[in-house]
Amino acid sequence: MSISEKPLSELLRPKDFEDFVGQDHIFGNKGILRRTLKTGNMFSSILYGPPGSGKTSVFSLLKRYFNGEVVYLSSTVHGVSEIKNVLKRGEQLRKYGKKLLLFLDEIHRLNKNQQMVLVSHVERGDIVLVATTTENPSFVIVPALLSRCRILYFKKLSDEDLMKILKKATEVLNIDLEESVEKAIVRHSEGDARKLLNTLEIVHQAFKNKRVTLEDLETLLGNVSGYTKESHYDFASAFIKSMRGSDPNAAVYYLVKMIEMGEDPRFIARRMIIFASEDVGLADPNALHIAVSTSIAVEHVGLPECLMNLVECAVYLSLAPKSNSVYLAMKKVQELPVEDVPLFLRNPVTEEMKKRGYGEGYLYPHDFGGFVKTNYLPEKLKNEVIFQPKRVGFEEELFERLRKLWPEKYGGESMAEVRKELEYKGKKIRIVKGDITREEVDAIVNAANEYLKHGGGVAGAIVRAGGSVIQEESDRIVQERGRVPTGEAVVTSAGKLKAKYVIHTVGPVWRGGSHGEDELLYKAVYNALLRAHELKLKSISMPAISTGIFGFPKERAVGIFSKAIRDFIDQHPDTTLEEIRICNIDEETTKIFEEKFSV
């Protein structure tokens, strides 16, 4: 065969370490393969990585550097009989102190019984086995063989790596490509050097003696330029946010389009595993199982069929109840200092440790009905509440368990923790950390929107805890009166809540501060108090209206709350209201009001 007749992938196949592009952790100066082969030795190993990442090219290095006989077999071409012949050859050579290395391409094509033939020969040292696979070794290689081999992970080649290979190839082919064509071919190759070289060969054969334009390339290969790195992140972001927004229609659209434009399905599967914990969490613990199972299915099935697995998972995650309580617990711990572990929780491994008090006083919960009431946190952190479940899905059940186990942290019948108490003209004003839906007051305030649609945030929690009657009464108000203007407040019953009424007040959406937001927030607070006064109530609890998803700056809101409450009391000295509570469940908002609020 002449040079011109050889495939481009063969012409450019690396012959020495310096010829390899990418995989520096393997072929670089400090790479494990380079250091080993330079001594003439090699260990049994599995070369695992995506197509076109350089695995098969290792054979040329083995032939050059390995101090022994090297045999190449492909599992797609050669059967067990040929493998057994090589194993016998290795057994004979070992008797004479010589070595044989079997390079077995695509070992995942062998079934488990065929793979077991290799085990004893690798164990005895009859052969050194170097096998390649594009499939996860944990799934496709029998444990007995896998335990006797080291896995070398080949990474997907970067765009920069592929561009270097492309430049070499265009010199060999003497082909002239526009820069946009080079970039498009690199993107089209998806980290696969073999795919890149095959594409270049097709282009060369179709457009000899011509400068190749992007239009030429797309005529030959179709759309190869549509999915840039920027659009990769844009589509991925839209996909995640659509699932977070519980919209399966949008989520499936972005998912399928990403795959059509060449996205790696494993990337999407990984993102869904993260999403299952970060955005669904313990509201539906099954979400993580489904996401992990989907990732395994993607590895086993591959495209195009695994797209169905991905779509199924995306729909499930989109419709699952949402909670970020796990994520928030993680973030809270990351902000806390490192403290010493209490002595009673330390394991007394030695007598000296016992003398120092390690393990002293520890009570084994299983000997006490499954639960021992004690402080397990470091002493300085004993009052911290790290995990705060949302009142949604399975976390509702977890919350009830926590209330029974740790009433001092999760409130028993009430979650309220009074952080600050003030008095103004005989009226009590309290800054409280807790769940407003459990407040034992005459009325709680809901931070509502103009159409009284109580879907998320505090509004959603109030409806879930109080029942559908709250939303039904709200809908009737809007049907009879129209939308509720920003700054105004209306009243419904409280359903199953401990409070008698819910006062729905509409706070402003923050738009920079130049659209009357301060005045509207003042009115929202004032009118909520006014509705309670009109009903001759004695106590009211309200959240930090507009400071959540409406984005009103919290520190700015404190002063407005203070003025509205003070003005209301001044202007209604005969009010029946005796207690005004500002209740928030999150620590940040509570702390800001605790530190800044004054009358």
UniProtKB/Swiss-Prot annotation:
Cysteine pairs bridged by disulfides in the record = none
Q: Which residues form the Macro domain?
A: 416-599
Q: Sorted alphabetically, which keywords does the UniProt record give?
A: ATP-binding, Nucleotide-binding
Top-level taxon: Bacteria
Read off the PROSITE patterns from this record.
MACRO
Which Gene3D superfamilies does this UniProt record tie to the protein?
A: 1.10.8.60, 1.20.272.10, DNA polymerase III clamp loader subunits, C-terminal domain (1.10.3710.10), Leucine Aminopeptidase, subunit E, domain 1 (3.40.220.10), P-loop containing nucleotide triphosphate hydrolases (3.40.50.300)
Q: What is this protein called?
A: Uncharacterized protein TM_0508
